[in-house]
C-alpha cells in the first residue's frame, strides 16, 4: 500500500473517524483505524461494536492496500504534520508517514482480527444539517447523564411522514422539538431511541453539508429498528439503538 494525500484532508478525516474510539476498549483491536487505499480515494473506518464511522477522502494511490493502525496515535501524528503532502507506505509490519522533514513510523495491528463494520442502513429520508444540529442541541440538554437510568440518557426520535419529533427527559426536565424533513416515503412511521451523546456528536460533525441522509435497518417488528445511520459529505456513521420502553412523555404536550 502506498499513497499521497493532502495533510489537512488527512488530519480532518482521521480526527473525525477516531473521535469515538473508546479510551479503554474491550479489545485492543478496537483502538485501531482501518485505512483502505483503492482507486483514487482512501477509506478510513472505526468501530467499537456500538458506533461505526467511515470517511472517504481523495488521494493519489500508487499501490492499493489495506492496513490497521492505532487511531489515536495516527490522529496525533496527523495534527502535528506540516502543511505539505503526506506520503504513506506500508512496509512489512510498519507504516511510514513522510511529510516534509517529518518522518513517523506506526506499528501495524492485525487486520484479520478487526470486526466487520455494519452495513449502512437504507436511507429513509434527508434533513437539513443546520436544522438537525440546532434541534439536537435544544433537546439533548434535557437527557439524563445518569447511567443508572440508561433509557433516559437517550433521545427519542419519532418519524411520522414529513415530520420528525425529538424528545428527551431526565425526569426533571423535558424537551421536545418538531421539525420538517424530506422522507423517501411520506407514509413512513418509525420510532428510534439514540444515546444523546452519540446524536450530539453526529449533529456537530455533520454540519458542513446541506443535507444529512438518515437510515434505519434491522427491523424486528413494524416501526422498530436496531440500527440508525447518518450520511453526509463523504462521511457515514452508524449506531445501535437503545432497547426498552421510553416514558410516555408525548401526552404531556
Q: What is each stretch, according to the model?
A:
Residues 1-253:
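Structural preference for solvent-exposed beta-strand-turn elements
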Amino acid at each position: 500500500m502506498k499513497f499521497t494525500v493532502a495533510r489537512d484532508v488527512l488530519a480532518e478525516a482521521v480526527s473525525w473517524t477516531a473521535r469515538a474510539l473508546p479510551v479503554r476498549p474491550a479489545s485492543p483491536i478496537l483502538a485501531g483505524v482501518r485505512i483502505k487505499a483503492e482507486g483514487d480515494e482512501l477509506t478510513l473506518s472505526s468501530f467499537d461494536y456500538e458506533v461505526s464511522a467511515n470517511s472517504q477522502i481523495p488521494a493519489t494511490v500508487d499501490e492499493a492496500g489495506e492496513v490497521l493502525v492505532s487511531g489515536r496515535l495516527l490522529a496525533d501524528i496527523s495534527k502535528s504534520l506540516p502543511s505539505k503532502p503526506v506520503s504513506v507506505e506500508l512496509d512489512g509490519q510498519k507504516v511510514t508517514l513522510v511529510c516534509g522533514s517529518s518522518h513517523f513510523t506506526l506499528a501495524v495491528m492485525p487486520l484479520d482480527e478487526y470486526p466487520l463494520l455494519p452495513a449502512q442502513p437504507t436511507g429513509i429520508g434527508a434533513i437539513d444539517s443546520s436544522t438537525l444540529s440546532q434541534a439536537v442541541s435544544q433537546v439533548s440538554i434535557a437527557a439524563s447523564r445518569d447511567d443508572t437510568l440508561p433509557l433516559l440518557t437517550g433521545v427519542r426520535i419519532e418519524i411520522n411522514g414529513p415530520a420528525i419529533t425529538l424528545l428527551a427527559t431526565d425526569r426533571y426536565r423535558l424537551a421536545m422539538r418538531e421539525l420538517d424533513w424530506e422522507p423517501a416515503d411520506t407514509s413512513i412511521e418509525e420510532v428510534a431511541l439514540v444515546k444523546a451523546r452519540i446524536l450530539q456528536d453526529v449533529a456537530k460533525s455533520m454540519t458542513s453539508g446541506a443535507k444529512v441522509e438518515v437510515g434505519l435497518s434491522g427491523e424486528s417488528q413494524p416501526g422498530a429498528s436496531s440500527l440508525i445511520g447518518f450520511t453526509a459529505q463523504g462521511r457515514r456513521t452508524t449506531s445501535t439503538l437503545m432497547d426498552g420502553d421510553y416514558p410516555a412523555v408525548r401526552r404531556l404536550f
